[in-house]
Curated annotation (Swiss-Prot):
GO molecular function (one): rRNA binding
Keyword RNA-binding attributed: yes
Family indicated by similarity: Belongs to the universal ribosomal protein uS17 family.
InterPro entries for the chain: NA-bd_OB-fold, Ribosomal_uS17, Ribosomal_uS17_bact/chlr
GO cellular component annotations of the record: cytosolic small ribosomal subunit
GO biological process: translation
Protein name per UniProt: Small ribosomal subunit protein uS17
Subunit structure comment from the entry: Part of the 30S ribosomal subunit.
Its job: One of the primary rRNA binding proteins, it binds specifically to the 5'-end of 16S ribosomal RNA.
Length: 87
């Protein structure tokens, strides 16, 4: 198909765990409007992402992209480390 582009979703989040080999857990936040009270509420989601170089540390702000599954729970891949955590 000529001109087809990769339309994979990307998200930004914070690394909350890096205790596994080549894997990190990234927490992302999103704001939704409560249907009854009309207040914006923060919802968080934790996803596992593939980190091939083990470059991420806890607290790093990263960008991840959806990809083909690496395992049962790991369907996201690390794109870039946007900001390193302050020590």
């Amino acid at each position: 198909m000529a001109g087809s582009e990769n339309k994979a979703r990307t998200m930004q989040g914070v690394v909350v765990s890096n205790g596994m080999d080549k894997s990190v857990v990234v927490m992302t936040n999103r704001y939704i409007k409560h249907p009854k009270y009309k207040k914006f509420v923060r919802k968080s989601t934790k996803v596992m992402a593939h980190d091939a170089d083990n470059a991420c540390g806890v607290g790093d702000r990263v960008t991840i992209s959806e990809c083909t599954p690496f395992s049962k729970r790991k369907t996201w891949s690390l794109v870039s480390i946007d900001e390193k955590a302050a020590l």
